[in-house]
């Protein structure tokens, strides 16, 4: 009720508030230093070819099965151009359309992370499939591309402002924190569906600037 259905990760707010309470109670109030998380540099990076082959084959099979189940291009196009957010793709448009969305959206995500030069470690691989979890809840390339664009624009904007202010800018578009942040920004796709691509992009820019500071509030007790 708080976010009115405009964030598909509906558990994020209550869990985040609980994490904020735990961080404040167990660490901040008691004056205990919160243990630092391991640096992203310590994560093992997989071969880009291996990850692309694994994801490409697995996700591509979803497209094959969707076609075998009778999914037509016009059915999937109806999802991409739906005037309202489709809250349950499988029940409203059919299981074959849902599977097609998993395949097409999955390849779309994979292409984006390749394009920005993201490191394919365990975290990155995990968030690809985390984003795919929203396929049945209505996320698809048509309402997520403005969010991706918003993140890219926000990265350049923040970098430029940092230079002017004499700051030490580290949150480039392929930084691990920003790569993960996009995963959760993906949940804002209902904003694009209802208000259009521009406001979806604006929501993504706002999310980019907030996501760098939220972990300081909940202290890592919440993965969102």
Residue ranges of each PLM-predicted region?
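Alpha-helical multipass membrane-protein architecture
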Residues: 1-224
